[in-house]
């Protein structure tokens, strides 16, 4: 071997350079030497870092001097936008948008300026070195240190249009500091959530792919996938990178010369990849885990390189787990969601094309545009059909390509200056996927005044709920003409009329407080309570002058007793000082004549009660009579039946224990009520028990009443009033129970006098005595201690004139006998007089005066107080609008709302009622200073009234009507606008999860079911119809949901499954559309094609999410996962096979079941490919042990037991759980089996095509590497060099196996194995 000359690189090596260097060393010299080299580089780096002592200090933070200019330019632009807004030329939304975009581009420019400034002034600046070498920090942090922090979002995720203009070097103001702390907190919370989410994602991925192990050498498939470059936004995943480590399906030939660049089944190294790209080949068909035909695993050639070693993957490598970790690990780096950017601003700003030189603009032939209002409110054109824009100037000419959706800011034939903005080019690839959402923004009035519509038509729309909204379909202007607006309090009447001239302090309106019933005025002591003063008017009163009120204290609670002259005692039910309504109980007679000792059954005899009446209050007695009471003792038990100590219908003495711990108080017959072996109730019925000989005669008497002296049965005479109960099965046999009945007589009228009173005005108030029965006829009253059967109550009745008033209960001392206290009932009308509060500025100043004195007698309807509303400033009254019944607001045009403009002798050109903006001509040489309305025109001057216009975009919801008076800050309208949903609906982790779980996205787009030509028609009501004329002439209609925008234009050709509207694509739709389309060509072909399409869609989508965040993952990892998601089909119809419909199985198993059908002529099974999310796929795996250890353990195990499943212990997880050696790496079974010496094993397949025994492994082609070192000098044995060392030792025997070689194992393998294993884990 010749000595190679060392290579000397003289350049700055940053992080990327270092990565490339180590990768190059690794792929050329193996792990050991790379480790050594990395070590040396580390020493070198630390040595010089120590000597240099790079640190960061305040002086290193250089703020670019151009910052001030940039900020000033931005401020100026924003000021112009603000002026346009106040002139009513752009809407609030457009202004906001302009502000956001201006600051964002300023920030961007400033960032570039920061970098430029560092480069030009001080390349060895420590901040610059750290950030750009990749050691610490990144550009966005440097930008915040020395540029500006930029725009921040508030907690709702809307952007605050006040940017942080300072940086950390200059220091933040307090406001800026507070604003920026929102974002900081959000960042922390987000990170915490992200780690959890990403961890769970990794777990699901590992579970779905843990059994993917390299088990075969070559599956000899004829299928492959096509790789090409992929762009996401501004990031590109180059074909060269995607090809690395893949195995080509067929020979790759040079397009021109035809020479074979890469032979079939050869792996592509970095050099070969470069060759292929240099030859101008744009797509290559490679083998892939997606198309691998190995059963239940992936073969070596379809997987390609193991990326950790840059050579073909080993047999028994657990590639599934590696794939899962490779996808899961970067999850934490994905942002959960970028800030919702309140406004339309999205992260990617369109590419701007500026004129390179002065000249004229020409549109290319194909370019079709339509007028368009940009999001900043400028007039421009939007490109409908892509084409070219040409700028010509003198000898020079330059062309720009404009894609569909780009915005052109110049017209055809317009002259432009150098550097002028010509167009914003839409980024073609992603613009398709942009979904929009409808958002609203309020427009609030900046001044109080009267509303006037200009060119604004309102149209009423009713929705399904019947609410009416007023919408401005075409947009227009709302002018607010300034003036002072007074809100009138409820009930106020204006005392002025339109056109009145008033002075400051004049009364505008007044409101009065009147009494309804009249009476005696009483002014309570506390004159000044918070809500205003209270005036009470006594309408009627009644005093119980014959009865005394005694105060008793029971158990620490005060209790009032009323004692009448006749000695009856009443308990007061309503406490003194409370209000009693009409019909409410005031007091109740204390009376024990109707008290029972036990519970029982109540019967009415000749008693009539009021039908209506709440059971709670009791039933009022209309006509007296007798109450019959049959006592019984009831115990509610609710215990187990085993605790019962007596039998049903047994006669017990008083004091017997009937149930454990329950004793009866009366003697009698026991009735036991039970349900489901639970004792509900025990009833003891007192009475005499008589055994009977003639059960039939006794049964007829059941339930009757027997009067004293009556013979019930022969020889049995009753001596008291009794009820007869027949008992069929007492322990002694049939018997009759004679139950005593108690009688209570009820008088027609209560024995209590009623109290009446009426005052002079004839309003009556009385206390009426009422008897009430709390229980109904035949009601069974459950009680042990007894109840009251009749209550006598005093009820308040107020005359029919004022039943809505309430009476106050008061206890007053008697005038004659100071010792006695009397009960008085007073009916009050209580009126609150408002206090004058200066708090509400919109109401003007109010002044309230009281017009009555204490003790006055007043008639009904008399005015008690008056409140005047006074004007704050002099002016002219206008805008009293009599809308229906009352006036709510008054407008006064004051002097401060007017402006007098002298015309210096020129005759004014405006007329009264004109609306003018600053700069508009009022007379020759005289312009309007502000936006205003013309109030009066004289020969030498014009009087203007200040006003503000507000532009309203089409479709806005109006909140006011023409002529309305609005206060400052009132909402005028709700602007409805569409904004692109930030980034891609959702980004990062949630999007990855949505894809891998194969969810149906919300608001998904409509896909073309068959190829054809589009017809797009826009209807008048903003709805869109899309039809596709297919190749055979069929017309297919596609429904467009509200809120979806078409992506296709009229006459455009669409292919199969192309999106027709915006929104995310549903992978399930892709699968079914392709499957249905190809079905006529055979099930297998259709299933394979449709699965391939959905696989490539998923791989590309997942790649694009990671790529947009700048994370690179090798395709093969995603492919392994997607393979697991798309491996199953669902049997729809079993045909004549032994399958079950609805069963999930692999495509291969379904085809195997169908093969014999082709021979026997039976009906084959029909199936549909299904796309399973990773969770579903994990639960549907063949191994029930793996599925059970993942989720829903009981369900999985139960089903497995019912189906009698067997687990073949294929994957890693099952083996780990059972405690066997895992079948990967050295535990891979083919080693054991091939060393058995029995080479000719057959694969035993069961009906599902599951292999039990794996045939011996064919010899794998070893990679050859030129080891430059001579063995004498450098015996560093590692994965790469080992074969050569061994070759030397064994004398060129290539088919060498450790186990069967002559060399003793220990000599070589210890070190080699350990070294290799550790390396493998730590390599990346």
Curated annotation (Swiss-Prot):
Residues 1293-1324 are annotated as: Disordered. Its EC number is 2.7.7.6. Binds 1 Zn(2+) ion per subunit. Zn(2+) binds at residues 219, 292, 299, 302. One of its GO terms (cellular component) is DNA-directed RNA polymerase complex. Belongs to the RNA polymerase beta' chain family. RpoC2 subfamily. This is DNA-directed RNA polymerase subunit beta'. It comes from Thermosynechococcus vestitus (strain NIES-2133 / IAM M-273 / BP-1). The lineage of its organism: Bacteria, Bacillati, Cyanobacteriota, Cyanophyceae, Acaryochloridales. The gene is rpoC2.
